[in-house]
A protein has these predicted regions:
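Hydrophobic, membrane-embedded alpha-helices of multi-pass small-molecule transporters
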Residues: 11-21, 162-171, 180-245, 280-289, ...
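Hydrophobic transmembrane alpha-helices that form the core helical bundles
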Residues: 31, 78-114, 289-306
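Selective recognition of specific alpha-helical transmembrane segments in multi-pass small-molecule
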Residues: 53, 57, 153-165, 227-252, ...
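Membrane-water interface regions at transmembrane-helix termini and the short interhelical loops
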Residues: 62-71, 129-150, 214-217, 326-338, ...
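TM-loop-TM module centered on a large, flexible mid-protein loop between adjacent transmembrane helices
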Residues: 69-73, 241-290, 297, 341
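Hydrophobic alpha-helical segments and their helix-loop junctions in multi-pass secondary transporters
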Residues: 93-97, 155-180, 198-199, 247-250, ...
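Membrane-interface loop-to-helix entry segments
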Residues: 135-165, 339-351, 370-378
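C-terminal membrane-solvent junction of multi-pass transporters and transport-like membrane proteins
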Residues: 354-420, 428-433
């Protein structure tokens, strides 16, 4: 097995970090810090466990399985195509990429020119997605682009904010708000869970695997080893950045009342750097959104070109980029109304697959564990989404009796029940053969 140099491992880790670290990762921790106030540190522990731990486990699970399709194929052969396609569409051009382009505009030119109309947005997104498409055309060069250029630049800017905040009186940590007062660690865990970064772990695996193959790592054992190391490295770096951003949010308590992390960051940046802070924040968002968009376009195009080989990688990259650009300009609000419920439906299924994949060594011989567990979680998830988006919470009076349902993780008990049933069915059918 070929061994990578430490520098190459670092570059792979930085590459994965930059693909994970998008606008949402910039916004969530400051708002957590703002709401947690004096309880920021214990809240961040919970946040990091889920926001960093789940993606790391996702990368490791994919590394063990070999690919997303292989992991999904343990449920059923048709599931190996259908489920990854749904995930790639909705976390890519269906939501993630157009939202990144839109947020890059809102936090950049949109902050400097609040009266800018749709024409300016169109001009900006044409340039933004042209750059994304151009840089996505050479997947083999992404490790150098992310590891040597974009990620160090992004980290330097975030470090500048942290250093400046340490030597500037910004504000005081206030009393925690809501559940951050009673159960700060658990609330932090729930907020980290809602970042849904574990979904990204499933689809970025193909990019990391191909980057490793370009470095001569061809065997399954080597790919699994270095993908896992990259996942842990990216997770550690994410944790450090979350602590910095959480602290920045915590000291903003006396600066005003805010309803989201973007407003917290904007106010802190203005306090620290004046009008120049708005420009710096715009650059940070632009680079973060650019990295995520490139990663998503690349991973989606690599997947679709392998699943549907009659259309080349470059054509898929063009299609994904153009569709994302159009959606960023034409009704992102409407897209969110459709995409967010679908993501809410597939997220518990994806997490169930990740957990099962981690223990495949022990459960793989039981033929029905994957299928029964995933289908029970899928049924519960569908009922939950219908309740929230169609039935206007009419079923909540019944569903609330499921443990952890009101906290947003009610799928855990159905998953455990499904796993137990899967074992029973597997053993029973095996005995009857």
């Amino acid at each position: 097995m070929k061994l990578l140099q430490k520098k190459e491992i670092l570059l792979i880790s930085l590459m994965l970090f930059s693909m994970f670290f998008g606008a949402g990762n910039l916004i969530f921790p400051p708002f957590l810090g703002y709401e947690a106030g004096e309880h920021v540190w214990i809240s961040l522990v919970g946040f990091i466990i889920s926001a960093t731990g789940l993606p790391i486990l996702g990368v490791i699970s994919i590394a063990k399985a070999g690919s997303f399709q292989t992991l999904a194929g343990r449920v059923h052969s048709s599931f190996a195509i259908i489920f990854p396609c749904i995930v790639y569409v909705f976390i890519g051009p269906g939501l993630g990429i157009p939202r990144a382009g839109s947020l890059a505009f809102e936090m950049g030119p949109g902050q400097l020119f609040p009266e800018a109309g749709s024409g300016v947005l169109l001009f900006y997104t044409v340039i933004f997605f042209s750059i994304v498409y151009w840089l996505s055309l050479s997947p083999s060069k992404l490790m150098g682009l992310f590891g040597k250029v974009l990620t160090p630049l992004l980290l330097c800017m975030i470090a500048l904010i942290f250093i400046k905040s340490m030597f500037t009186t910004v504000g005081d940590m206030k009393e925690p708000i809501g559940n951050y007062g009673q159960a700060p660690m658990f609330q932090g865990f729930l907020d980290g869970y809602l970042t849904m970064d574990a979904l990204a772990a499933l689809i970025f695996g193909i990019v990391i695997a191909n980057a490793l193959r370009a470095k001569g790592i061809e065997d399954d054992k080597g790919l699994a080893k270095y993908m896992s190391i990259a996942g842990i490295g990216a997770g550690l770096l994410l944790s450090i950045i979350y602590v910095i951003l959480g602290y920045v949010g915590a000291i903003s308590g006396s600066l005003g009342t805010f309803d989201n992390g973007a407003k917290v960051l904007a106010q802190v940046m203005t306090t620290l750097f004046g009008q120049g802070g708005v420009v710096l924040l715009g650059l940070i968002f632009t680079i973060a959104c650019l990295c995520v968009s490139i990663g998503l376009v690349t991973s989606c195009s690599q997947f679709f070109s392998s699943a549907f080989p009659k259309v080349s990688y470059k054509v898929w990259a063009f299609i994904v980029s153009v569709v994302s650009m159009i959606l960023a300009n034409l009704g992102l609000t409407q897209i969110l109304k459709v995409s967010v419920p679908i993501l809410g439906f597939i997220y518990p299924i994806a997490l169930t697959l990740i957990i099962l994949g981690l223990f495949h060594k022990y459960i793989g011989k039981y033929a029905y564990v994957y299928a029964v567990t995933v289908w029970i979680v899928a049924i519960f998830s569908a009922i939950d989404i219908l309740n929230k988006n169609v039935m206007m919470n009419q079923w909540t009076s019944v569903l609330k009796y499921i443990p952890f349902y009101t906290e947003g993780v009610g799928w855990i008990v159905p998953a455990i029940v499904g796993m137990c049933l899967g074992f029973i069915v597997s053993i029973a059918l095996n005995k009857n053969k």
